[in-house]
Amino acid sequence: MDDERMLLLSLSQIEGLGNKAKKALLFHFGSAIRVFSCTEREVKGLLFLSEREKDALMSGLKEPVPKNIIESLKSYEISFVTVKDSEYPALLLDVYNPPFIIFYRGTLPKANEECVAMVGARRCSAYGKKASLALSSLLAKNGISVVSGLALGIDGFSHEGALSQGGRTYAFLGCGVDLCYPASHEDLFERITKNGAVMSEFPPGTKPLKNNFPVRNRLISGLSKRVVIVEAAEKSGSLITADFALEQGREVYVFPGRYDDPLSRGTNKLIYQGAGVILSPEEFVSDLLSIKDTALSFTGGTVKGKTRNLEDDEAIVYSCLDFYPKGFERLSTETGLPLLSLISAVMRLCDRGLVMETFKNEYVKV
């Protein structure tokens, strides 16, 4: 591990500094090495940090990475990726408060890997089990990866279905990746590391505390363009994932259920609020594949002709845009362009009819 990565790990573990502050420090100083060599006078002059954050930074600069974390990385073969790394899952840059660092065991998703998130009730019904196994196995059979949270019930069956077809699946944990929670999923945990990854923003040694799980839900939806709520009661934690998905501009789908079934009240309510309905796993996957084919066809014909005379910065921005929304923060990271140049290029692409704004300050290819 080189000095920069070691210091990025150290920066990630400074208590009292949020992800936003850590990224701002990297942007300001240019590298973790420079952050850790800054003087007290420089810290006091940082206008984007509060006095409390400045104190936290000064304390953190004196402390190396905790030995227990280093030992866990080695003992459990844990890797990590930071927001500064090209391997960092790009979709996660769109989530609220993107993790500064992600610890994982296994292999990260590829840049253009298609993922669908699947979540639902822990104490699911036979119907929920059947639906989650059927959909996840069919997704995997067609080369689409499954993202979930390793919980009992729908989460576990979603991972199992993907693995049954030799597919890839990813689990975001509410604890460190050196721990398997629940313990009964230890075998599933190990199989996921060989056909995907178990991932967490929490450092090794973090216990599965109750408050960690709603926080990690934003990453389950964030890693996917589409989120499926298989089965959920009226106050299910899965509805938190649905809320995050909507905030992130993701599509939300549900399996419908009987009106008098407590485990379908949450999903049926989402239908009432406008969520997509999955009439069958086959139809849902068929629609996904047709959307994928349509997106690929946009690279030819009229659009291709319109992109021939783009300015350099316009071409860079256009190549980074996709058919799902991206915001300026993510585009800035992907393109490396100064913010003003980026905004100007996006506006010109909008004027040309190549790009459109779908949400406030979020853009897609047309």
Placement of each model-derived feature along the sequence:
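Short, positively charged patches
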Residues: 1-141
